[in-house]
């Protein structure tokens, strides 16, 4: 197959003004995708023979991009002998020595020299051969033009020489902050005799064409909840992102909020970064301090130090409880994790009508609704995110951004306006058993689970739906209607944010990573759920009839989800939302607690269609993947402190290859004694002999210091390539494999 031909087009103009007008037309058409180029520059020569680069542009229609990539290549073509070092500053001067011979041998120098005369200007554009006619039309005011063609092999030597010449202007991005640049020019007694170095001015710059990144995280949601993964909740935005890109059906999290968030933002295992439990309850042992080690810089910090602007919005849950408030210490707050701006709540849960809002390093209190309307956090969260994006673009048209959007949904309390819950009236009347079966069948139909997958059994502790009284069914069905409406509203607001990215024309070059859950669906509502989740925290269990009697004071069961309630649903609904797996939140031992939906899109690079990827992936893989996709290395030194390598493995290799061998082959899981080890498809696990929500004094004493012996826990064994849902325990058949994996865990 013949090499694709590259054309370098040189257009001569009688004045700089005429050239500038055509250059602007070209860049506008490139940005509008009417024509494609690799790079373009405008060079002028005044009456005294002084030569200077006036304008530069890249393949995205961005102007003033400096000397990187194709722009630097064109500067190199023109630099010797037409451009002296004093004309283009240190960057051009660096190119002259190494690049000159290659450029002259190519014959391109003669073409440029003939076009550029005193008092005139030239526009030089580089493009693929099939774009030449469109570029010539855009540069239609030129008095003359000539084109030189070279194939990819022919210009490789030129570009290699340019890259070597430009090397001294490429910072070491493994050391952060990037050290101040040394002045690359020369200072004489006058400006005219001095060598300029404009490269010192902009500060850290992201790699050429670096994409934006939008990372969305839903809270306390399960594998079998969203319609995109076969569940009963409408998720059109999750569908939209899936259809633009890829679906990952073996993405894993830790089984609890804070540990997953720490793993997600650092690319490291949760114990390595001090978050073995939730942030509110740090402990006096390594791995449980609730404090991020300075040797584990989060990837938002890496982005921010490399030319990105970073914003975090929504639920945080990574600040220890004792650090809340005006005394800090603020190195435990979001800005210290690499965010230039934060708006949201620091705690692990909040009412959606009355959150305590923190902005940057200041707690600003509980917002009020406008015009007599109730305040609703999900709407304001999205408004604030969009306002930030607009503000970033109003100041800087080109700087790439990273936006972390973390909802309070679907963590209890399940707050949502009644009209959203009413969309699901009657849809769950047949109960959680029917929901699981229906979801499982849709998952097989969609290809989310393999056709030979087994639906795991309902735990004996959970009541069968058909065994319930009418009073119980009345309460429980409304609990699920409220939860579904709450969840769909969150997806709707994610859609508003993606629409805003599209409206500013940046969706094509934005990586969208949408994760439906930081752990499995929450079973903390106990067997009965509650009209007010604080009953759980205080060890109070109210029977359904008692709950119905109490909520009659506030408008009856239809009031669930309103400002007068703080509801959570019954644990069997969480189990249903984790279909087809066992258990849920807090249970690191089983996939119901650790496997969640993820979809990824990047229109500029990922082929649309929702193709499924089944390689093992984990929250710690997100950071390494983002860094690889945007063209940045891991940091090795931050603030003078040597960094621990990220534990995660980039899954960028899966974007274009559904059948690629998985590279993340070993991973441990552990939360509150519930634990598992994954290795080469095998999964060994053990859980405490208790229900996740059982914090009674008797149970706490049974598992307290001196009483609990982890060696007595019963381990299970699964081979996931043949058992997607973790349904068949092989511990008795393969005891040697189980012992081998237990040793790997410890």
Language model regions located:
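Accessory carbohydrate-binding/adhesion or oligomerization-edge regions at the termini
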Residues: 746
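Short, low-complexity, glycine-enriched hydrophobic/amphipathic alpha-helices that associate
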Residues: 57-103
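Cytosol/matrix-facing juxtamembrane amphipathic
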Residues: 3-28, 34-45, 100-168
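Switch/connector loops and helix/strand junctions flanking conserved nucleotide-binding motifs
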Residues: 52, 132-135, 523
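Short juxtamembrane and helix-loop transition motifs at transmembrane-helix boundaries
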Residues: 47-55
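Formylglycine-dependent sulfatase
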Residues: 169-711, 715-716, 724-743
């Amino acid at each position: 197959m013949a090499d694709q031909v590259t054309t370098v087009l040189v257009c001569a103009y009688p004045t700089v003004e005429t050239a500038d007008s055509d250059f602007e037309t070209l860049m506008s058409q490139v940005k509008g995708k009417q024509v494609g180029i690799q790079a373009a520059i405008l060079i002028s020569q005044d009456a005294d023979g002084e030569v200077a680069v006036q304008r530069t542009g890249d393949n995205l229609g961005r102007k003033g991009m400096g000397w990187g990539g194709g722009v630097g290549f064109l500067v190199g073509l023109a630099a010797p002998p037409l451009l002296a070092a004093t004309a283009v500053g240190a960057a051009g001067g660096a190119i002259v020595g190494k690049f000159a011979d290659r450029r002259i041998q190519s014959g391109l120098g003669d073409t440029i020299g003939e076009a550029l005369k005193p008092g005139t200007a030239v526009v030089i554009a580089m493009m693929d051969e099939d774009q030449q006619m469109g570029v010539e039309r855009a540069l239609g005011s030129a008095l003359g033009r000539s084109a030189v063609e070279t194939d990819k092999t022919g210009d490789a030597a030129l570009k290699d020489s340019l890259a070597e010449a430009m090397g001294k202007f490429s910072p070491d991005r493994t050391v952060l902050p990037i050290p101040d640049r040394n002045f690359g020019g020369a200072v004489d007694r006058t400006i005219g005799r001095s060598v300029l170095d404009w490269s010192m001015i902009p500060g850290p710059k992201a790699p050429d064409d670096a994409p934006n990144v939008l990372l969305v995280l839903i809270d306390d949601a399960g594998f079998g909840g969203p319609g995109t993964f076969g569940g009963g909740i409408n998720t059109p935005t999750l569908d939209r992102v899936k259809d633009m890109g890829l679906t990952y059906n073996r993405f894993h999290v830790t089984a609890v909020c804070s540990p997953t968030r720490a793993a997600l933002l650092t690319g490291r295992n949760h114990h390595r970064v001090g978050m073995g439990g939730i942030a509110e309850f740090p402990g006096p042992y390594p791995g449980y301090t609730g404090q991020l080690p300075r040797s584990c810089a989060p990837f938002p910090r890496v982005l921010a130090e490399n030319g990105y602007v970073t914003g975090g919005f929504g639920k945080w849950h990574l600040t220890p409880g004792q650090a809340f408030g005006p005394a800090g210490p603020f190195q435990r707050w979001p800005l210290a994790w690499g965010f230039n701006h934060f708006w949201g709540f620091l705690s692990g849960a909040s009412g959606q009508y009355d959150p305590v809002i923190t902005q940057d390093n200041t707690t600003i209190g509980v917002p009020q609704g406008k015009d007599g309307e109730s305040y609703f956090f999900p709407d304001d969260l999205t408004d604030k995110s969009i306002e930030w994006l607009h503000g970033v673009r109003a100041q800087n048209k080109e700087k790439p951004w990273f936006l972390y959007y973390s909802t309070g949904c679907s963590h209890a309390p399940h707050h949502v306006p009644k009209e959203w819950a009413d969309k699901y009236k009657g849809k769950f009347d047949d109960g959680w058993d029917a929901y699981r079966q229906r979801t499982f069948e849709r998952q097989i139909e969609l290809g989310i689970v393999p056709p030979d997958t087994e639906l795991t059994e309902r735990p004996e502790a959970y009541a069968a739906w058909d065994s319930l009284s009418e009073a119980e069914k009345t309460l429980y069905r409304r609990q699920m209607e409220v939860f579904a409406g709450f969840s769909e509203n969150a997806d709707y607001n994610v859609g508003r944010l993606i629409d805003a990215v599209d409206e500013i024309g940046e969706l094509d070059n934005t990586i969208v990573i949408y994760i439906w859950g930081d752990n499995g669906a929450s079973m903390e509502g106990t067997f009965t759920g509650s009209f007010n989740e604080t009953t759980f925290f205080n060890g109070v269990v109210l029977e359904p009839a008692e709950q119905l009697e109490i909520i009659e004071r506030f408008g009856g069961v239809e009031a669930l989800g309103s400002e007068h309630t703080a509801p959570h649903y019954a644990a069997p609904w969480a189990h249903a939302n984790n279909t087809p797996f066992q258990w849920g939140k807090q249970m690191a031992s089983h996939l119901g607690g650790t496997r969640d939906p993820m979809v990824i899109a990047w229109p500029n690079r990922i082929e649309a269609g929702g193709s499924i990827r089944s390689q093992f992936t984990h929250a710690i893989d997100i950071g390494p993947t983002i860094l690889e996709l945007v063209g940045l290395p891991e940091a090795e030194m931050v603030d003078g402190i040597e960094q621990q390598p990220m534990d995660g493995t980039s899954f960028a290799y899966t974007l274009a290859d559904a059948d690629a061998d998985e590279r993340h082959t070993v991973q441990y899981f552990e939360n509150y004694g519930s634990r598992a080890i994954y290795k080469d498809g095998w999964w060994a696990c053990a859980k405490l002999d208790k229900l996740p929500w059982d914090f009674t004094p008797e149970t706490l004493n049974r598992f307290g210091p001196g009483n609990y012996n982890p060696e007595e826990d019963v381990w299970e064994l699964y081979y996931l390539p043949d058992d997607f849902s973790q349904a068949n325990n092989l511990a008795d058949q393969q005891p040697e494999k189980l012992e081998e994996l237990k040793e790997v865990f410890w």
